[in-house]
Amino acid sequence: MAKKSQIAKQKRGAKFNVQNYTRCERCGRPHSVYRKFHLCRICLRDLAHKGQIPGMKKASW
């Protein structure tokens, strides 16, 4: 419930731009969110393993 209320609070918009922060669009996690994908590292990895992110592949060297 706390996560849902925080997401709803964020959608209303902050009084100042500095107060805005990124959240994962898939799970709502506030930490470690990649701006380019709007996903947290956990969801990004999961979708990459499933092959649902075009052009992303596992690094090998």
From Swiss-Prot:
- What InterPro entries does the annotation carry? Ribosomal_uS14 (IPR001209), Ribosomal_uS14_bact (IPR023053), Ribosomal_uS14_CS (IPR018271), Ribosomal_uS14_sf (IPR043140)
Q: Does the keyword Transit peptide apply?
A: no
Keyword presence, Membrane: no
Q: Provide a GO CC annotation, any one.
A: small ribosomal subunit
Q: Biological process GO terms, please?
A: translation
Matching Pfam families: Ribosomal_S14 (PF00253)
* GO terms, molecular function: rRNA binding; structural constituent of ribosome; zinc ion binding
Q: How is the cofactor bound?
A: Binds 1 zinc ion per subunit.
Cofactor list? Zn(2+)
Keywords in alphabetical order, please: Metal-binding, Ribonucleoprotein, Ribosomal protein, RNA-binding, rRNA-binding, Zinc
Amino acids binding Zn(2+): 24, 27, 40, 43
Q: What role does this protein play?
A: Binds 16S rRNA, required for the assembly of 30S particles and may also be responsible for determining the conformation of the 16S rRNA at the A site.
- What quaternary structure, including any partners, is listed in this protein's UniProt entry? Part of the 30S ribosomal subunit. Contacts proteins S3 and S10.
| Similarity section | Belongs to the universal ribosomal protein uS14 family. Zinc-binding uS14 subfamily.
State what protein this is by name.
Small ribosomal subunit protein uS14B
Its organism's taxonomic lineage begins at: Bacteria, Bacillati, Bacillota, Bacilli, Lactobacillales
